[in-house]
Amino acid sequence: MLAKRIIPCLDVRDGQVVKGVQFRNHEIIGDIVPLAKRYAEEGADELVFYDITASSDGRVVDKSWVSRVAEVIDIPFCVAGGIKSLEDAAKILSFGADKISINSPALADPTLITRLADRFGVQCIVVGIDTWYDGETGKYHVNQYTGDESRTRVTQWETLDWVQEVQKRGAGEIVLNMMNQDGVRNGYDLEQLKKVREVCHVPLIASGGAGTMEHFLEAFRDADVDGALAASVFHKQIINIGELKAYLATQGVEIRIC
């Protein structure tokens, strides 16, 4: 059995790490490189960096900090933000990133997933999916351009359909960003994760809602996700990664202990 992964997420805007609630009202957390180094030292399995306004601004991720991060950590990291071409991806990978993640650009041009997978291999192509639960219809819908709340829009895709579509096109991993839960720390949306797990045959990463160690356990045990991504509980030092992994190990979760 592959070890489950603990993945801190660093949302980047204007060269700094920020964090919002339900993708809105972002506050500045701190500088990118020191935070990345701290998480690596605490025992994170990998890191994810989202340049959250790159796609909505029509630009590619700011690459200036990617090489600096690569110099100070020795764990894999993934970079996302406005990657719309093979050239964009190649540059980011050349600066030291291990994976690239696409979200809004994949919705705009789904063939991008296949072209990236063919060029770089499925193992380093992650598709992020920003999913919103509509309480009136009882359905999950994919959102686009979520880094800028003034430009966020609901797409034609229902989440389960898009999960299946991106796999057909070559996604090697899926990060499910559950917008309703984002930043509120009341637990992952287990029901949605279970439904996605049924149709997701590549590694699935849960994102949005972690507030306690038990929330991570529930995602691994009840929804069988491969990794759990979180931000505010790590940024605000509510949960220490080393202590979290020790707890998960006592609960029978296969996890890498540093």
From Swiss-Prot:
GO molecular function: imidazoleglycerol-phosphate synthase activity; lyase activity
Compartment annotation: Cytoplasm
GO biological process: L-histidine biosynthetic process
InterPro entries: Aldolase_TIM, His_biosynth, HisF, IGPS_HisA/HisF, RibuloseP-bd_barrel
Catalytic reaction(s) noted: 5-[(5-phospho-1-deoxy-D-ribulos-1-ylimino)methylamino]-1-(5-phospho-beta-D-ribosyl)imidazole-4-carboxamide + L-glutamine = D-erythro-1-(imidazol-4-yl)glycerol 3-phosphate + 5-amino-1-(5-phospho-beta-D-ribosyl)imidazole-4-carboxamide + L-glutamate + H(+)
Domain of life: Bacteria
EC number: 4.3.2.10
Function: IGPS catalyzes the conversion of PRFAR and glutamine to IGP, AICAR and glutamate. The HisF subunit catalyzes the cyclization activity that produces IGP and AICAR from PRFAR using the ammonia provided by the HisH subunit.
Recorded GO CC terms: cytoplasm
Alphabetically ordered keywords of this record: Amino-acid biosynthesis, Cytoplasm, Histidine biosynthesis, Lyase
Pathway as given in its UniProt record: Amino-acid biosynthesis; L-histidine biosynthesis; L-histidine from 5-phospho-alpha-D-ribose 1-diphosphate: step 5/9
Entry-linked CDD domains: HisF
Protein name: Imidazole glycerol phosphate synthase subunit HisF
Family to which this protein belongs: Belongs to the HisA/HisF family.
Oligomer and partners: Heterodimer of HisH and HisF.
